[in-house]
Amino acid sequence: GDHGRMYRGLAPEMVPAMYTLCSRASLILPNTTDAALLLGDPMPGVTGEAELHTAQTQAQRLTRICPRVLITGVAAGRGIACVGADRATGESLVRTPMVPKSFHGTGDIFGAVLVGRLLQGNVLPAAAQAAAVFVADCLKATPDEADERLGVWLESVLPRLMHNPE
């Protein structure tokens, strides 16, 4: 889901199936809506530090399902955060400046960069920071008048990712 509701076309029966799938993963990347759905919590509607605190609590609770959790898209003051919890090592937090744009596919880009950095040997907080910065750079490179349904303009930003592998 996103923005406090399930994606159109998905039935509520999908939530228990996603829970089962997540229990078999070593890392999950729910956004705030997905985290609420998986835990049976109310949909996110708060902003700022209240949302940050809720996400920290949810991340810890989600480690009962999966050993490593990174909740994305958490409002944190004037920024946006990824709130992580690791069953073995504890909690991590990554904050980046808020880019006031919303485009389809940014979560997919975040996940792709994160996994790439993890495969390069980065620890989760460093991989999450690199992914968050890359997505923010993509958002900044996308004109305000661009169609949000078509995603961000990442092509001009890709060289930064390729020439800065760490």
Question: Where would I find each of the regions flagged by the language model?
Answer:
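Short pre-catalytic strand/loop immediately N-terminal to key active-site residues, enriched for Gly-Thr
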Residues: 91-105
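Short, small-residue alpha-helix embedded
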Residues: 36, 101-124
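N-terminal glycine-rich phosphate/adenylate-binding segment common to multiple enzyme folds
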Residues: 1-2
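Glycine-rich beta-alpha junction loops
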Residues: 34, 73-77, 97-100, 132-135
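Conserved phosphate/ATP/ADP-binding segment of small-molecule kinases
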Residues: 6-91, 125
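Charged C-terminal helix
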Residues: 125-166
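Phosphate-handling active-site elements
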Residues: 91-92, 117-131
